[in-house]
Amino acid sequence: MTGQYPLDHGVVENGWGLDEDEPVAAERFRAAGFDTFGVVSVDHLAHEHSRLGRGFDRYVDGGSRYDALYPILSRIYDTKTFNTVFGAVKNVGPGRYTVKNLLRGLGLIQLHCRTARSVTADAVGRLEGVSEPFFGWVHYFDVHEPRNAPGEFLEGHDEYTAAMMHVDRQVGELLATLEDRQLREDTLVVLTGDHGEALGDHGYTGHGRTLYDEELHVPLVFAHDALPRETVDAQVRTIDILPTLLDLVGADGLGADGEPLFDGGPVRADRPVYAMAYPTFGDRVGLRTDGWKLVRDRAGNDEALFDLSADPEERRNLLEDSAAGVADIDPDDVDGRREALSSDLEGWLSGFEATERQEVDAETEEMLADLGYRG
C-alpha cells in the first residue's frame, strides 16, 4: 500500500503497524475522488495491528478474535508440537467434516484467518451501491498455511492446489459480480501475490527463509479490454503496482521507491529488485537484476551468485564453483560480476537507518506463531 521496501517504512515483521506519517495509496485515491474499500482475510492485517485501514472509506477486517478454549489447548501443546500433529491429521474426515473444521467449529483452534468465500461475500457487499470511480483491495489468504480448502477441491488434489482452486473460484465470483452490476467494463483488475512458496524446492517448504525465485516470483496481471493480451518478460516489482495505478488515474504519487510501469513505451527491463528474508528466519538480503542474482547471508557471512539466464532454477552457485576452480568458470568474470552487484546492494542497504523494533503483546505473538511467523 506504500510502494516502499519494508526497510524504508520500517514494518519488517508481521504484527507491526505502519507509522501514521507514511503515505498510503488509499489516501491518495480518496483525495482524487475515489470511493475506497478494503477487505482482508488474516488477523495481522486487521487495522488494529497493521494500521493499513487509513484512507479506506470501509475496511473490513473482522478484527482479531481469540476463542476461549484455544489458550487452554496451546498451553497443553507447544506450538511446534501442535502444528506437527495437526498438520498430519487436519484433513482427515469426509468432505467438509474434517478434523480441522471440527476443532475450529468447537473453538479449540484459532486459525486467525477466514475463508475466501467469506472474503468474497464481504467484497460483494462493499460493491453494493459503490460510487464510481472506486478503488478496492480484496485480500485472500487461503493458499497460505493453515490453508483453507473445501472438501470438494481436496478430492484428487494436494492441499496447496485445492486452496488455489478455491481462491480461483472465488475470484471468478467477484469478477462475475462486477459484470452483473455493469462495473467490469470500467474497472481495471489487478491480480498479484505478496510472495511465492517453496514446495520442496532447494530442500525448503514454506516461505520467508530463502530468496530463491520460487519465493520471489509472483503473478502480476493487469486485466482490461483496453489492454493488449500479452506477456511482459521484463522484470517488475510489487512496489511498482500502486505507483502505476495512481499514475494511471492522475492521482498524487507516493514519493516512494516504486515507479509507474507504463510511460508510453515498453516496460523497462532494468529495474533492480532488492529483497530480504523474513527476519525471524535469518538475515538474508539479495539483489536480482534481469539476468543475475546475488544473495548474502549476513549472519553466516556467505554469498551466492546465480546466472539466471543460464541457470534459471538457481542450482549453481558460481562463487562456490569459482573458488573450487571448476574448468568452465572464469574467476575474473565472476569476481567482477559479484563486485558490481555487491556494490549496488551495499548502496541500497546504506540508505536505511537501523529499524526500530516494535513491541507486540502476548496474544499477537501467539497469533504470529500459529501462522508460522515465529521460528
Where are these regions (language model features)?
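Catalytic domains that recognize anionic headgroups
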Residues: 1-375
